[in-house]
Amino acid sequence: MSFSLNFTLPANTTSSPVTGGKETDCGPSLGLAAGIPLLVATALLVALLFTLIHRRRSSIEAMEESDRPCEISEIDDNPKISENPRRSPTHEKNTMGAQEAHIYVKTVAGSEEPVHDRYRPTIEMERRRGLWWLVPRLSLE
Protein backbone atom coordinates (compact mmCIF):
# COMPACT_ATOMS: atom_id res chain seq x y z
CA MET A 1 0.00 0.00 0.00
CA SER A 2 1.39 3.35 -0.86
CA PHE A 3 0.32 6.72 0.52
CA SER A 4 1.06 10.07 -1.09
CA LEU A 5 -0.09 13.65 -0.66
CA ASN A 6 -0.36 16.18 -3.42
CA PHE A 7 -0.11 19.87 -2.37
CA THR A 8 -0.35 21.53 -5.76
CA LEU A 9 -2.82 24.38 -6.09
CA PRO A 10 -4.82 25.17 -9.19
CA ALA A 11 -3.75 28.33 -11.07
CA ASN A 12 -6.79 30.41 -10.12
CA THR A 13 -6.47 30.08 -6.33
CA THR A 14 -4.16 32.05 -4.04
CA SER A 15 -2.71 31.28 -0.65
CA SER A 16 -3.80 34.61 0.84
CA PRO A 17 -6.52 34.70 3.51
CA VAL A 18 -10.10 34.92 2.37
CA THR A 19 -11.42 38.51 2.35
CA GLY A 20 -14.97 37.83 1.24
CA GLY A 21 -14.26 38.36 -2.42
CA LYS A 22 -12.96 41.92 -1.98
CA GLU A 23 -9.37 42.72 -2.80
CA THR A 24 -7.63 45.11 -0.39
CA ASP A 25 -4.36 46.88 -0.92
CA CYS A 26 -2.31 46.89 2.30
CA GLY A 27 0.80 48.37 0.70
CA PRO A 28 0.85 52.01 1.95
CA SER A 29 -0.56 51.22 5.39
CA LEU A 30 2.02 48.49 5.86
CA GLY A 31 4.78 50.90 4.89
CA LEU A 32 3.50 53.48 7.36
CA ALA A 33 3.23 50.86 10.12
CA ALA A 34 6.80 49.78 9.46
CA GLY A 35 8.00 53.40 9.57
CA ILE A 36 6.47 54.25 12.96
CA PRO A 37 9.00 52.25 15.05
CA LEU A 38 11.78 53.88 13.06
CA LEU A 39 10.40 57.34 13.86
CA VAL A 40 10.03 56.46 17.56
CA ALA A 41 13.58 55.09 17.71
CA THR A 42 14.93 58.23 16.02
CA ALA A 43 13.04 60.48 18.44
CA LEU A 44 14.38 58.53 21.43
CA LEU A 45 17.92 58.74 20.08
CA VAL A 46 17.64 62.51 19.60
CA ALA A 47 16.23 62.89 23.14
CA LEU A 48 19.09 60.81 24.56
CA LEU A 49 21.70 62.89 22.75
CA PHE A 50 20.07 66.11 23.93
CA THR A 51 20.04 64.84 27.54
CA LEU A 52 23.72 63.81 27.40
CA ILE A 53 24.78 67.17 25.94
CA HIS A 54 22.77 69.03 28.58
CA ARG A 55 24.30 66.97 31.43
CA ARG A 56 27.82 67.47 30.10
CA ARG A 57 27.34 71.25 29.84
CA SER A 58 25.89 71.49 33.35
CA SER A 59 28.69 69.34 34.82
CA ILE A 60 31.36 71.45 33.08
CA GLU A 61 29.77 74.64 34.45
CA ALA A 62 29.60 73.13 37.94
CA MET A 63 33.23 72.02 37.68
CA GLU A 64 34.36 75.50 36.64
CA GLU A 65 32.44 76.98 39.55
CA SER A 66 33.94 74.53 42.07
CA ASP A 67 37.50 75.10 40.81
CA ARG A 68 37.32 78.69 42.01
CA PRO A 69 39.13 78.99 45.38
CA CYS A 70 36.96 79.83 48.37
CA GLU A 71 37.39 83.09 50.18
CA ILE A 72 37.71 83.02 53.96
CA SER A 73 34.44 84.91 54.34
CA GLU A 74 32.65 82.33 52.17
CA ILE A 75 33.95 79.49 54.33
CA ASP A 76 32.82 81.22 57.52
CA ASP A 77 29.41 82.09 56.07
CA ASN A 78 28.71 78.65 54.63
CA PRO A 79 28.43 75.97 57.37
CA LYS A 80 28.54 73.17 54.79
CA ILE A 81 32.01 74.21 53.61
CA SER A 82 33.32 74.83 57.12
CA GLU A 83 32.12 71.44 58.40
CA ASN A 84 33.20 69.34 55.43
CA PRO A 85 35.93 71.05 53.41
CA ARG A 86 36.42 69.58 49.92
CA ARG A 87 39.81 71.12 49.45
CA SER A 88 41.86 72.79 52.10
CA PRO A 89 44.09 75.60 50.77
CA THR A 90 46.64 74.93 53.51
CA HIS A 91 46.72 71.18 52.83
CA GLU A 92 50.19 70.08 51.79
CA LYS A 93 51.41 66.64 50.87
CA ASN A 94 52.80 64.78 53.83
CA THR A 95 56.57 64.66 53.54
CA MET A 96 58.90 62.72 55.77
CA GLY A 97 59.54 64.54 59.03
CA ALA A 98 56.80 67.12 58.51
CA GLN A 99 54.47 67.90 61.38
CA GLU A 100 50.83 67.00 61.11
CA ALA A 101 48.32 69.81 61.01
CA HIS A 102 45.27 69.42 63.21
CA ILE A 103 42.09 71.09 62.02
CA TYR A 104 39.27 71.67 64.46
CA VAL A 105 35.75 72.58 63.43
CA LYS A 106 33.25 74.29 65.65
CA THR A 107 30.05 72.23 65.57
CA VAL A 108 26.51 73.52 65.80
CA ALA A 109 26.45 72.68 69.51
CA GLY A 110 29.51 74.86 70.01
CA SER A 111 32.09 72.18 70.84
CA GLU A 112 35.27 71.75 68.81
CA GLU A 113 36.01 68.40 67.19
CA PRO A 114 38.91 67.31 64.98
CA VAL A 115 38.07 66.81 61.32
CA HIS A 116 39.03 63.53 59.66
CA ASP A 117 41.20 64.15 56.61
CA ARG A 118 39.72 61.99 53.85
CA TYR A 119 42.83 62.28 51.70
CA ARG A 120 45.08 60.79 54.38
CA PRO A 121 44.70 57.09 55.19
CA THR A 122 43.66 56.17 58.69
CA ILE A 123 46.16 54.75 61.16
CA GLU A 124 44.66 51.28 60.67
CA MET A 125 45.26 51.46 56.91
CA GLU A 126 48.86 52.59 57.44
CA ARG A 127 49.37 49.71 59.86
CA ARG A 128 47.96 47.22 57.31
CA ARG A 129 50.24 48.57 54.60
CA GLY A 130 53.21 48.15 56.90
CA LEU A 131 52.41 44.47 57.48
CA TRP A 132 52.11 43.47 53.80
CA TRP A 133 55.04 41.07 54.11
CA LEU A 134 53.07 38.87 56.54
CA VAL A 135 50.58 37.91 53.82
CA PRO A 136 51.57 34.57 52.28
CA ARG A 137 52.33 34.63 48.57
CA LEU A 138 49.93 32.35 46.77
CA SER A 139 50.63 31.14 43.27
CA LEU A 140 48.13 29.63 40.86
CA GLU A 141 50.57 27.04 39.49
From Swiss-Prot:
- Keywords noted in UniProt: Cell membrane, Glycoprotein, Membrane, Transmembrane, Transmembrane helix
Residue intervals passing through the bilayer: 30-50
Keyword Transmembrane annotated: yes
- Origin species, per record, is Homo sapiens
Q: Which residues lie on this side of the membrane: Extracellular?
A: 1-29
How this chain sits in the membrane, per its record, is: Single-pass type I membrane protein
Cite the ranges annotated as topological domain Cytoplasmic: 51-141
UniProt function note:
Central nervous system-specific myelin protein that increase myelin genes expression during oligodendrocyte differentiation. Promotes oligodendrocyte terminal differentiation.
Task: Output this protein's name.
Answer: Opalin
